Amino acid sequence: MPRFEAQKSSMVPYHIRQYQDSDHKRVVDVFTTGAEEYIPSTFRHVLRLPRTFLLLLGVPLALVLVSGSWILAVICIFFLLLLLRLLARQPWKEYVAKCLQTYMVDITKSYLNVHGACFWVAESGGQVVGIVAAQPVKDPPLGRKQLQLFRLSVSSQHRGQGIAKALTRTVLQFARDQSYSDVVLETSTLQQGAMTLYLGMGFKKTGQYFKSMFWRLVDICFIQLNYSFPSA
């Protein structure tokens, strides 16, 4: 199995290599933790929405006017905040559960045994600290051969060391070697760090959309990005 050249940051060395079955537990941990980190930021984003402010102000105020009880209003605010927290949590939990029940069940089968696909890990100190995957786009635009980047995640203790950029470069090099014309991916307006990384590496924004009514209600859209190779 090929290994890629070791990379060094100013703090600790790491190297990028293809996934092995023995990595599975740690890969799942990195993926799950990375995805669920967006639950608090989604909740904070929801709290900043004007419609949320109106909800948290209007409903308790209506209760005070009807019942005359400020205690009831405070209890109402508490339960509204709890409900909003659960709503912010649900889509990320569903996303993780869906991935763990499909592509992530057997990573070798889903990626390494698929022509034109791959899954890599970043390893530091004998431990997997970052992951990224890529699969061919099933129905690319006419005349294009596209690879989609998925699952990019780096453990919180190893961020700021260039690992995410190195993993992305690994995907780009793989795509170039496999004669793909483009690398495409999706991220969200909530993931500003990822957006900054991709745009800084030459990806271009090609579109945006809301994945579901929930994302529309909370005003979080998904951004489509494309990296086209000059020779394509």
UniProtKB/Swiss-Prot annotation:
Residues bearing PTM N6-acetyllysine: 109
GO cellular component: endoplasmic reticulum membrane; endoplasmic reticulum-Golgi intermediate compartment membrane
Gene3D superfamilies assigned: 3.40.630.30
Reactions catalysed according to its record: L-lysyl-[protein] + acetyl-CoA = N(6)-acetyl-L-lysyl-[protein] + CoA + H(+)
Membrane-protein topology: Single-pass type II membrane protein
EC top class, as a word: transferase
Protein's name in the database: N-acetyltransferase 8B
Higher taxonomy: Eukaryota, Metazoa, Chordata, Craniata, Vertebrata
